[in-house]
A protein has these predicted regions:
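Hydrophobic beta-strand segments of well-ordered beta-sheets in folded domains
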Residues: 10-16, 36-39, 63, 89-96
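Active-site nucleotide-sugar/metal-binding loop of Leloir-type enzymes
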Residues: 52-62
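Catalytic-site signature of metal-activated, phosphate-bearing donor transferases
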Residues: 81-317
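N-proximal low-complexity "stem/linker" segments adjacent to membrane-targeting elements
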Residues: 1-33, 317
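Short beta-strand-to-loop acidic/aromatic patch adjacent to the donor-nucleotide binding site
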Residues: 61-74
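A short, glycine-/small-residue-rich helix N-cap motif at loop->alpha-helix starts
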Residues: 42-50
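Short alpha-helix within the catalytic core of nucleotide-sugar-dependent glycosyltransferases
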Residues: 51-52, 74-86
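Short acidic, S/G/P-rich loop/turn micro-motifs used as interaction or catalytic elements
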Residues: 19-23, 70-73, 102-104, 120-123
Length: 317
């Protein structure tokens, strides 16, 4: 073992990456109290450009990134990344840990803590900088093929709060309603939908469509998620628009005056009829019940355990 085999997270630069989140100043103060050495990158347009700016702000080759809506657990900064006996790819990989979503209780990478290397971030081309003809990176960093060094990890170290305002909650739902309907960034046909969209995405999409009435602005998130799926799968709307946050403002102006529950119910009937998606908005009490039991058997296994490792164990691959 050499000195580079184990990295203390506390020795890494920590970048708080914010844009237009309504709670970003409050969260920045909390992050600075928790992580006094934290730095901030704010209001950089475009996800790829913002991450590149975060990489440039870091003085350490590997760094920790906190999204603007995310509040980490303080214990995260006491952990170590132990690369002893790990494949060399672990040292090169980017890690996306899970976050608990405050709206619906989901635990996955959306909004979660992440760790990047300056070299990788400087050379990646995602979102607004994706390569011509490559749609896999339109709305996410998830990548396949030989360059797959962006890894979904199993452990959960934070909670994301994308529901501070009606617009923020609606946008969060809409974005996920679009992303989870796609097949590696491409829009499937209606007939292909259930075959090409992974079962895990469908499970999470269904939860976005139905859970969250127990929290402030949760119904706006449900409406947004249903609308995102509807516009992606059943209209001619260009789903590539999802990558630019400015586009949401214009779209929001068309929907801000509407009643979210009434609209979500109407869209739900169409999604059930055309895509055979389960539509059942849970009451606040039912949502609380679901979230309590959904997270009951979730526990951390180690910061370098990948999500795929656990899935293989569970499914006996």
């Amino acid at each position: 073992m050499n000195s580079n085999d184990i990295i203390d997270v506390a020795d890494l630069d920590c970048i708080y990456l914010s844009y237009d989140e309504p709670q970003k100043e409050e969260f920045w103060l909390k992050v600075k109290h928790m992580v006094p050495w934290a730095k901030r990158v704010d209001n950089v347009k475009g996800s790829d450009a913002a991450h590149k700016a975060a990489g440039e702000a870091s003085d350490t080759e590997r760094f920790i990134l906190i999204d603007g809506e995310n509040m980490p657990e303080e214990s995260f900064f006491n952990i170590q990344l132990d690369f002893t006996d790990k494949d060399e790819k672990f040292r090169q990989a980017q890690f996306r840990w899970k976050a608990i979503n405050n709206i619906n209780g989901l635990r996955y990478g959306n909004g979660g803590m992440s760790s990047w290397t300056k070299e990788y971030v400087a050379n990646m081309k995602t979102h607004e900088h994706q390569k011509d003809g490559d749609v896999s990176r339109i709305a996410d960093f998830c990548m396949g093929g030989d360059d797959n060094l962006y890894w979904a990890m199993w452990d959960c170290f934070s909670t994301t709060y994308p529901n501070h305002t009606p617009f923020q909650a609606w946008r969060a739902g809409f974005r996920e309603g679009v992303k989870m309907s796609l097949d590696r960034g491409a829009r499937p046909t209606v007939d292909q939908f259930k075959e090409t969209v992974s079962s895990r995405n469908l499970d999470n999409l269904t939860i976005w469509h139905n859970i969250g009435a127990d929290v402030e602005n949760g119904m706006w998130a449900i409406y947004g998620a249903r609308l995102g799926t509807y516009m992606t799968m059943l209209t001619e709307w260009d789903h590539a628009n999802v990558q630019w946050f400015d586009n949401y403002i214009t779209l929001w102006e068309e929907h801000a005056h509407r009643d979210p529950e009434t609209e979500a119910t109407a869209i739900g009937e169409v999604l059930y009829d055309k895509l055979d998606l389960p539509m059942c908005i849970h009451t606040p009490e039912q949502s609380k019940f679901f979230k309590r039991h959904y997270g009951a058997d979730k526990y951390n296994r180690g910061p370098l355990v990948t999500e795929m490792e656990v899935i293989r164990q569970i499914q006996g691959w």
